[in-house]
């Protein structure tokens, strides 16, 4: 039977991929984080639901794998893209622990990650090389996150930041800004997008020096331009290098 890991739960229905919608419709059981399941309730009224809360990812994915082994068609819901800070990797790791002859098939269905949705709202900030960095230190040491941010800034990558702030991480974004300021001008464009792709999405365009941290929360995606990025007509533009 097919164990499906898919995405799009955080998007408005028009933004979900057709393949993801079809996978949901063909599944017997939907497994996911309660918040994400609520976002697709219009599509799963007739499905069996297995949901749980934050920091229960292993239990959630193990349940999905167990159900698939039993013969059910299971859809595991991730926000954005399942392969970008989502559940795809965990599901595949758990499947590898099952004897080969009993392993369920798994199809990873791509979706629209927050960096891309945020970039579209801001204009064209990701037109050149970029790095995506999460500031969550639940599974990655803060020192390693800082090192990655420093190297990305030194390499002049556009930087997309996930999980920039939470109740327990109120200063991390400011620390990253100070790291990037060692390599970028204070006027470097910065975009903050809240609820990317969801109802109520809004965004702010500012600069690295004046980054309005009061506009940032755990539902925000922050994009910091590179040395060539600029602001024009309410957009952040990162030139690709075309001769104009």
Per-region residue spans from a language model:
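Single conserved hydrophobic/aromatic residue that forms the stacking wall/gate
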Residues: 1-8, 12-13
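Short beta-strand segments
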Residues: 8, 76-79, 109, 133-136, ...
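Class I S-adenosyl-L-methionine
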Residues: 10, 14-106, 212
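Class I SAM-dependent methyltransferase SAM-binding "motif I" and its flanking Rossmann-like core
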Residues: 18, 86-155
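A polyampholytic, Gly/Pro-enriched intrinsically disordered region
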Residues: 72-78, 124-135, 154-155, 209-218
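Gly/Ser/Thr-rich loops at beta-strand to alpha-helix junctions
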Residues: 80-85, 112-114, 166-167
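A contiguous loop/helix-start segment that scaffolds small-molecule binding in enzyme catalytic cores
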Residues: 154-244
